[in-house]
Design a protein with these regions (language model features):
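Conserved helicase motor core of P-loop NTPases
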Residues: 304-481, 487-490
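Accessory, non-ATPase domains that flank or precede helicase/AAA+ motor cores in DNA-metabolism machines
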Residues: 1-144, 150
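C-terminal accessory regions
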Residues: 380, 496-608
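Pre-Walker A adenine-sensing motif
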Residues: 154-168, 427
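Structural motif
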Residues: 174, 270-272, 298, 441, ...
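ASCE P-loop NTPase helicase motor core
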Residues: 162-164, 168-389
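Residue-level signature of catalytic and energy-coupling elements of molecular machines
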Residues: 66, 123, 212, 244, ...
Length: 608
């Protein structure tokens, strides 16, 4: 039995289903518990699976869970849950909530690595406390301001106005909505409203932030644009610039620590974070520790998008079902402020329900938009509806089903058409404009249909067309790059994209990056952290970015990384035109597959 379990775990490692690191953790804890034996054999299995679960995006491993079991491990290998629980708690290295132990097993039989359990507990506690707090406001003054900021456009509740009213009443506000639903437009008006309603002698200290430099730049741009349409006399003392969360918190190079923490909190009254679906558990825990208890927090995001690359689906857990579940008391307050409000929930609402709102009306994609229709169809999970949209003949949507050699020939044409302007740009500014107009997105990194294969193909195509000069295959003018590792001293972060271009002042080739304020900043190539070519990037890396035109390439075979959320995120990166290259069966499999990440956060946030 002992040899069987270990040999099966070894085989799972060899097949790439679990990491060698996962098995080593299991073996280490088995040794700490006293070595081999039936009980410790069950510990070896549990610890290895808990660690492997984290590498697959889960926060914990439910003991009853066998659907996501590596194929090399037969379900019969899993002990009966109640017996397994007893043996784990008797091992000496597994504790319960409140204990300090390498592994934590909660009452629902969810097994956590200690640090992730601590993060989940902290996040749940901090958010529940903020959601429970009540803000006082003058309803007469507030209603007049809300009417100025959100003039009536029709019958029924204006959810953007309702979100602003919620911001007055609740120190924590979670706004979810698809692309073009006006999240940042609403946020700009919320900032104006809160600043106008503030009774202090000094204006509110407000910060804008996002997980990546690109997302921060987009937030900056959106808030500036929204300010232009504010009513006269409003919009004073608005923040000038968004920044990355790492910069806001003061990341310390070479560590996972931040300058701002519970002992040295941020000096803020209000923090607005965009693209919150990209925030992982560790970063959110650090943020909540550094945010003063009295400060307001507004999170903007799209619950249907991909979750963070790291463990958890934090923003989706915050949003719950997405449907309004407001209390009678809150609805009465909203009615007083706006004159209208949806009906209160018939079911008892959880602690976070009164702090969440879903914006539904899209303004970017009109009724005749194929991109918007396809995103909605994918989100519904209906393969039939997806196919109906794809073959309706929308002008902003193109579908290509070619495979094999035909696919490569077609891709060569698309690469030349899409990147000609960037590769042939006369100036750095023109090159950046062209780079931000078109992007090729892949679902995977490896293989001929992954970013590695497509970037190699793109460089070959452009070189043969005479658009890349010189023999150097890495350092050449016009090469787009993406940063893969944070470099805090250079203010470069994982996912930042740049362009290699000669500096007009010294004619030296440098890597240029767009800062959140719009400036182009040069970096000497020898100082760059880990990076790669970025004609094509993964959908994960493109999250938080938008492009006028996107070519979305799915692999020719089914892959476990394909999911409805991945597809939806890729589709909604396109603003004006989407070209989808996908095998029919692979596309259908992606639409049917829903990402499920195990954690206890949603239960802790939404259970009464």
């Amino acid at each position: 039995m002992i040899r069987s379990t270990r040999s099966l775990l070894e085989r799972a490692c060899e097949q790439g289903e679990i990491r060698r690191l996962d098995l080593h953790l299991g073996l280490f804890l088995e040794k700490q518990a006293g070595g081999a034996g039936r009980t410790n054999n069950e510990l070896l299995l549990a610890a290895t699976l808990a660690s492997a679960a984290v590498s697959n995006g889960h926060v914990c491993w439910p003991l009853e869970q066998n659907a996501a079991l590596p194929a090399a491990l037969p379900p019969a290998l899993l002990p009966e849950p109640s017996r397994w629980r007893r043996s784990l708690l008797a091992s000496g290295v597994v504790g319960q909530p409140g204990d300090t132990a390498p592994l934590i097993l909660d009452q629902q039989n969810r097994l956590y690595l200690y640090r992730l359990h601590a993060c989940e507990e902290l996040i749940a506690r901090e958010l529940r406390n903020r959601a429970a707090a009540i803000s006082e406001t003058d309803p007469q003054v507030a209603r007049l301001l809300l009417e100025r900021l959100f003039p009536r456009k029709g019958n029924g509740p204006d959810l953007q106005q309702t979100a602003a009213a919620l911001a007055l009443l609740k120190p924590l506000l979670v706004i979810s909505g698809g692309p073009g639903t006006g999240k940042t437009y609403t946020a700009a008006r919320i900032l104006t409203l809160l600043q106008a309603m503030h009774s202090g002698s000094k204006p509110l200290r407000i910060a804008l932030a996002a997980p990546t430099g690109k997302a921060a730049a987009r937030l900056d741009e959106s808030i500036r644009a929204a300010r232009q349409s504010l009513p006269d006399g409003l919009g004073h003392n608005m923040p000038e610039q968004a920044q990355t969360l790492h910069r806001l918190l003061g990341a310390r190079p070479g560590t996972d620590e931040f300058r701002h923490n519970r002992d040295n909190p941020l000096v803020l009254d209000l923090l607005v974070i965009d693209e919150a679906s990209m925030i992982d558990m560790m970063l959110m825990a650090a943020l909540l520790e550094a945010l003063p208890a009295r400060a307001r927090l507004i999170l903007l995001g799209d619950r249907s998008q991909l979750a963070s690359v790291e463990a958890g689906s934090l923003f989706a857990d915050l949003c719950g079902s997405g449907e309004p579940a407001w209390s009678e008391q809150l609805c009465a307050q909203l009615r007083q402020l706006t004159g209208d409000c949806p009906q209160p929930s018939a079911e008892p609402s959880g602690p976070l329900a009164d702090s969440c709102i879903l914006l539904r009306t899209g303004h970017r994609f009109h009724g005749d938009s194929g991109i918007g229709s396809l995103a909605a169809a994918v989100n519904s999970g209906s393969v039939e509806e997806v196919e109906r949209v794809l073959f309706t003949g929308f002008s902003d949507l193109e579908i290509e089903h070619c495979t094999g050699r035909t696919r490569e020939d077609w891709l060569r044409e698309q690469i030349l058409r899409g990147f000609r302007d960037m590769a042939g740009a006369a100036t750095l500014k023109e090159g950046f404009v062209a780079m931000e107009k078109f992007r090729l997105l892949c679902a995977v990194h490896k293989g001929p249909n992954g970013t590695e294969g497509i970037n190699s193909l793109a460089a070959t195509v452009l070189r043969r067309a005479g658009l890349i000069s010189g023999r150097d295959t890495e350092w050449y003018q016009g090469r787009p790059i993406i940063i893969l590792r944070n470099h805090y001293d250079l203010q470069l972060f994982n996912g930042d994209t740049g362009l290699l271009w000669r500096d007009e002042r010294d004619r030296q080739l440098k890597a240029w990056f767009r800062r959140p304020d719009g400036r182009l900043h040069p970096v000497v190539p020898s100082l760059l952290p880990e990076r790669e070519t970025a004609y094509a990037v993964t959908i994960h890396k493109a999250q938080g970015s938008e492009f006028e035109q996107v070519l979305l390439l799915l692999p020719e075979e089914e892959s476990r990384v394909l999911s409805r959320e991945l597809l939806y995120t890729g589709i909604t990166r396109a603003k004006s035109r989407l070209i989808l290259c996908a095998d029919r069966e692979t596309l259908a499999a992606a639409v049917r597959s829903r990402t499920q990440r195990h954690s206890g956060l949603a239960e802790k946030l939404h259970s009464s």
